[in-house]
From Swiss-Prot:
Protein's name in the database: Bifunctional protein FolD
Keyword Amino-acid biosynthesis among UniProt keywords: yes
GO molecular function, one term: methenyltetrahydrofolate cyclohydrolase activity
HAMAP family attached to this UniProt entry: THF_DHG_CYH
Length: 282
């Protein structure tokens, strides 16, 4: 039976520290504030937005939601971004992805002020990570993976890590982050041949495919540490990850659950970044 790596325990510890820091900011009449930009009305985006707002309210972090039409002109979006960048009361800016196809992703990401880029979307902030500098904002999901491993005293040094994702949201930045911790990294993707033969040799497997219960027990060895980043809906309408949790947990060394795993830490780190930004700009 695997050790279950609960993310909500990690999140709770981070929030305890945030409460103290937010109280100190209040003494200076500073209230941390996040601007959320959502284009369109996709149910997943609305649900995510509500969860962020709820989490912010619990810590007395203010939010400002900009609900935008999916067909918004790029120039109008950039004008709004410029306004938010210049608004002193706004400490962090989060733009929901993916963007409508008519918008240039690089231009949108580059329009976010570097000091308000709380999910590390700006190319210059990402470049810093690729250069091995982990001192500023990091993408929240990859950072959540690192924080959970750190909380449970799982040392990355010398470990063989397989990441099943090659996106700029998870796979690529995470690969650079674990490299900075002296791990050896393999990135796999949809074109990888014989994926189980690769993952089975790994010490740590991180999966972010987005396919419910696709990853079965034959992908792992008895000592595997499994980090399931995805949040999917299974055949019964329940939340699940990429990994067939109930079967795999009997065969590996440790595993994150879904829910109460990586996702809970991801949102908490977003809150931490907002507070970080408020402190830096105070």
């Amino acid at each position: 039976m695997a050790k279950i790596l609960y993310g909500n325990e990690v999140a709770l510890k981070i929030k305890e520290d945030l409460n103290l820091r937010i109280d100190k900011l209040k003494e200076k009449n500073i209230i941390p504030k996040l601007a959320i930009l959502r284009m369109g009305n996709k149910p997943d985006d609305i649900a995510y937005e509500r969860s962020i707002i709820k989490s912010c309210e619990k810590l007395n972090i203010e939010t400002k939601v900009e609900e935008l039409n999916e067909d918004i002109l790029e120039e109008d979006f950039l004008k709004l971004m410029e306004s938010l960048n210049n608004e002193k009361e706004i400490h962090g800016i989060l733009v929901f992805r993916p963007y409508p196809k008519h918008l240039n992703e690089n231009i949108i990401n580059s329009s976010i002020a570097l000091n308000k880029d709380v999910d590390c979307m700006h190319p210059l902030n990402l470049e810093r990570i690729f250069e091995g500098d982990l001192n500023g904002f990091m993408p929240c999901t990859p950072e959540a993976v690192i924080e959970i491993l750190k909380y449970y005293d799982i040392d990355l040094k010398g470990k063989n890590i397989v990441i099943i994702n090659r996106s700029m949201v998870v796979g690529k930045p995470l690969s650079m982050m674990v490299l900075s911790h002296n791990a050896t990294v393999t990135i796999c993707h949809s074109r990888t041949i014989d994926l189980p033969s690769i993952t089975k040799k790994a010490d740590i497997v991180v999966t972010a495919i987005g396919k419910a219960k696709l990853i079965k027990e034959e992908y792992f060895n008895e000592d595997s540490i499994v980090m399931d980043v995805s949040i999917n809906i299974d055949e019964n309408g329940k939340l699940c990850g990429d990994v067939d949790f109930e079967n795999v947990k009997e065969k590996v060394g440790a595993i994150t659950p879904v829910p109460k795993g990586v996702g809970s830490v991801t949102t908490t780190l977003l809150l931490k970044h907002i507070v970080d930004a408020a402190e830096r700009n105070s």
